[in-house]
Amino acid sequence: LSLYRPGPMEHIPTYIRRHHGLEPVSYSEFPHAEKYLKPILDETYGIPVYQEQIMQIASAVAGYSLGEADLLRRCLAEGSLVLDAATGQRVPIEKVRPGMEVFSLGPDYRLYRVPVLEVLESGVREVVRLRTRSGRTLVLTPDHPLLTPEGWKPLCDLPLGTPIAVPAELPVAGHLAPPEERVTLLALLLGDGNTKLSGRRGTRPNAFFYSKDPELLAAYRRCAEALGAKVKAYVHPTTGVVTLATLAPRPGAQDPVKRLVVEAGMVAKAEEKRVPEEVFRYRREALALFLGRLFSTDGSVEKKRISYSSASLGLAQDVAHLLLRLGITSQLRSRGPRAHEVLISGREDILRFAELIGPYLLGAKRERLAALEAEARRRLPGQGWHLRLVLPAVAYRVSEDSSAVSGSAGE
């Protein structure tokens, strides 16, 4: 745990008053711990100022060794997302509360659901941004340990190119199982839809779907009509792209598709799109359906890989995370501020994609996936564009996940 000097910012006025004799030193907030705190904090007027004091307190009160107490200094930056193991939602670390279940790596290298016992705010510290070759990023303190083939090592001791462990799968399943029509509409609109605000004052949400694929157009129409919307089609005279617009079922009523867009929090420009929060709470079957429909839009099935492209970096990161829920590892590539791609190239990952997500693909991509699956089966196990040394719950990405570290300061 690291603190401002003196202590957290809200303790600065108290420190000043006590330093000038305007306020007595008191441990009334911790009556049972005063005998431990007083010898350690007496010289700083009852306020923790130095990291060493925190380590001494942890040792005296909780029985930690100084080495174990040193681990308390290691932290993630504000805004880092923590996976709720019970619901599948991702929670900013500053909003994590005791009782929430998270994943912890056991000594057998398996992930276990464990409850959060306490949340410690560590104030402002220098952090660095770690970027792996596979596109993952973390913002954490330089002394935060990471798992390598040689064991746990502080980030500051890792040279460029060091392989680090990442989850081979996130064993979490939500509890939501929405109707197929809702899941399909959300995925199709997220991929090939226009859901930004429009109108003279920019307050009216859009819900337009664009495609030339007859199967996608039929699926969108079917699902929109199942919600009660009227659907109108417009064909571009030059490109042949079809625009499907929805209307309210009767005068004075609300367009149910636009209502869905608002309810799901999908009102956004292309570069701002994110996977709706509800999707992170889907059961595995609903999640596979969502990803299948989404890859039917901006996804590609190529000769040796599967990819998904987006103008939104956040959306690409969300997709990579959801794939990992199904045990599919991927790489994230960015070729500009509005050009991001999720790549699936490993043999086992392609086969798993074909098994779990393939049945929900629409249009010509389904046929191309069958050909790619056949090609992947002809490869030897482990043959591909990266090598994984797989433990029960983690994988060392030896070529595609070698870490690259760039320093920065922040909170």
Predicted segment positions?
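Alpha-helical scaffold/interaction cores of sigma-54-like transcription cofactors
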Residues: 1-75
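Alpha-helix capping and helix-loop boundary segments enriched in small/acidic/polar residues
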Residues: 27-32, 45, 87-93, 152, ...
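Extracellular/lumenal glycan-associated surfaces
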Residues: 60, 97-98, 295
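Long, charge-dense accessory insertions within large macromolecular proteins
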Residues: 76-117
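Internal intein/HINT superfamily modules and their associated LAGLIDADG
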Residues: 106-411
